[in-house]
Regions:
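Short, solvent-exposed mixed-charge patches
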Residues: 334-335
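Bacterial signal peptide processing site
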Residues: 22-24
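C-terminal motif of bacterial Sec signal peptides marking the signal peptidase cleavage site
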Residues: 18-20
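Hydrophobic membrane-insertion alpha-helices, especially the h-region
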Residues: 13-16
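Bacterial N-terminal signal peptides that target proteins for export
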Residues: 1-8
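Concave beta-strand-loop units of leucine-rich repeat
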Residues: 30-157, 161-179, 183, 189-201, ...
Length: 335
């Protein structure tokens, strides 16, 4: 055999060998996708969800991230109570922009919620403990929150966390020594806001909130000017008496003239009662409209319509506070 033919045969044999090696690495046609086991959980690389909840992962979160990056169809990664720091969970979330990454946040003494929560009711220190500014630093991870009640906690002064809540519709922050409302300017979907018994003196951050319809600023002793929100098309505006909220009467009357359809109350003393929560004597079309709403019931016939809806949104009926015993997904893990 000539030398040239030997060289050609050698190259041909080498090519067949390399092709065979490559083919061996591929799964057989029509075979099952590759499966892995991570922390005792069996899953496939083609899976759309990976749930590692209640497994102590801690510093092993990097292995989870490395694996998740190999899963092209991954839509949800759930790591509830895995002992991973919030900051590290945020790294995973940011590294997987096409995947919903979910973990658990504990706050107060008994309050808890997963980061995919849309509602948090944490307004009873006697039930869940006091919510503090330190707790609220963790609220930036609740990016899907729509309804939030953290009133009655007495120590809250920082609202910066709401900048991370683009879908926030309802905020009750009443009975806290809060002053600066600047972060609320980013909450473009905000529709309902209770600020009574706070230290706010400037409503200008609310001026651009075109969806805001219900505003309660009763018993805000430092508030003396409502002119920044003259253009807001509110449906209900509660200020309380001049003694409790010293806004000049001429400003109140000017707002009434600008918005004749708005229910403006600067006469009632109690900021959470009266027409704010209790229905006036509804008659005719208004009464018939109210009866057709899904949140209406015979038990709620004396509630103001918006307050009846609020009870549904925040789970007031049944005292659905965001506590461990009210959360069906919570489990004790011991770490």
């Amino acid at each position: 055999m000539k030398k040239r033919e030997k060289i050609l045969l050698l190259f041909l044999a080498l090519g067949l060998f390399l092709f065979g090696c490559g083919a061996a690495k591929q799964p057989p046609s029509g075979g099952e996708p590759e499966r892995l086991n991570l922390y005792g959980v069996d899953f496939g690389l083609e899976d759309e969800e990976l749930d590692l909840s209640y497994i102590r992962i801690g510093d092993g979160w990097r292995d989870v991230l490395k694996t998740a990056r190999r899963m092209p169809n991954l839509k949800r990664l759930v790591m509830d109570s895995c002992g991973v720091q919030n900051e590290d969970m945020a790294v995973i979330r940011d590294a997987l922009p096409e995947t919903e990454v979910i973990w658990r946040i504990n706050f107060g003494l008994q309050y808890t919620a997963r980061t995919d929560a849309t509602r948090i009711l944490a307004s009873s220190p006697s039930i869940g403990g006091n919510v503090t500014n330190r707790d609220l630093k963790k609220f930036k991870y609740f990016t899907k929150l729509r309804f939030l009640d953290i009133g009655h906690n007495e120590d809250i002064t920082d609202l910066s966390f709401v900048r991370y809540m683009p879908d926030l519709e309802v905020l009750i922050i009443a009975m806290n020594p809060l002053g600066d409302l600047t972060p609320l300017a980013d909450c473009k979907k905000l529709e309902y806001l209770e600020l009574f018994y706070s230290r706010t003196d400037d409503l200008s951050p609310l001026a651009g909130l075109k969806n805001l319809k219900h505003l309660n600023v009763g018993h805000c002793p430092y508030l003396k000017d409502i002119s920044p929100i003259y253009d807001l098309e509110l449906e209900r505006f509660y200020l309380g008496t001049f003694a409790s909220c010293p806004v000049p009467p001429e400003q109140v009357e000017h707002y009434r003239e600008l918005h004749p359809d708005c229910e403006v109350d600067n006469e009632s003393w109690e900021s959470s009662e009266g027409a704010w929560r209790r229905a006036a004597c509804l008659e005719g079309e208004k009464l018939e409209w109210y009866k057709k709403q899904p949140y209406y019931s015979e038990e709620r016939q004396y509630y103001a319509p918006r307050y009846a809806l609020l009870r549904d949104q925040l789970g007031y009926d049944g005292l659905q506070y965001s506590t461990k015993w009210n959360d069906p997904t919570w489990q004790y893990v011991g770490w």
